[in-house]
Amino acid sequence: MKDLVDTTEMYLRTIYELEEEGVTPLRARIAERLEQSGPTVSQTVARMERDGLVVVASDRSLQMTPTGRTLATAVMRKHRLAERLLTDIIGLDINKVHDEACRWEHVMSDEVERRLVKVLKDVSRSPFGNPIPGLDELGVGNSDAAVPGTRVIDAATSMPRKVRIVQINEIFQVETDQFTQLLDADIRVGSEVEIVDRDGHITLSHNGKDVELIDDLAHTIRIEEL
């Protein structure tokens, strides 16, 4: 039963992530993200639809019901609170934080959540600049405001300029090679980097190191002008 619950939560969180990125949540996108077969995803989505968690719209996009969104919000809140705990208190290496938080999100109790918001200094955003949603349910106030700034893919031009990193989406954190390149260049949320689009290839430069972003990930980092 626990595996079934974890799978449901994982699917809902993936839909939530896609929405955050401005990507239409389709079964094909879930199959790509979770590395599952098309038939497996279709069966799981059908079960979630029967359970009243999602609706398959006429354009085949997946829309969360109010019940589904409440559950997705809770899972993402636990995930990002865990990321803050792992980073701010435990001091886990930043490249391990996301994967560890993925395990914690399924087992963290409501009581632990309420303690965390009292212990942690900053519960507005994750260490990667992502808003921690649904804090009003913990009596902290709502943090669902949109992240400031612009997606790299929408901001880069052929003229190099300095910008500040304000958000690194969840999907970027699981792309190990690209994320490692970013960390090796000491690029974090808050870093001031040079951004340029060279013939359709977007590059971030920091401390003398260049990171050429994979095309499929250029929408997953947000920046703001200096």
From Swiss-Prot:
It is found in: Cytoplasm. GO terms for cellular component: cytoplasm. The keyword Transcription applies. Gene3D superfamilies: 2.30.30.90, Iron dependent repressor, metal binding and dimerisation domain, Winged helix-like DNA-binding domain superfamily/Winged helix DNA-binding domain. One of its GO terms (molecular function) is DNA-binding transcription factor activity. GO terms for biological process: negative regulation of DNA-templated transcription. It holds the Pfam family DtxR. Changing I214L: In strain: C7(-), C7hm723(-), CD95/305-, CD95/211- and CD95/407-. Keywords: Cytoplasm, DNA-binding, Iron, Repressor, Transcription, Transcription regulation. The N-terminal region may be involved in iron binding and may associate with the tox operator. Binding of dtxR to tox operator requires a divalent metal ion such as cobalt, ferric, manganese, and nickel ions whereas zinc ions show weak activation. PANTHER family: IRON (METAL) DEPENDENT REPRESSOR, DTXR FAMILY, IRON-DEPENDENT REPRESSOR IDER. Iron-binding repressor of the dipheteria toxin gene expression. May serve as a global regulator of gene expression. Represses ripA under iron excess. Homodimer. This is Diphtheria toxin repressor. It comes from Corynebacterium diphtheriae (strain ATCC 700971 / NCTC 13129 / Biotype gravis).
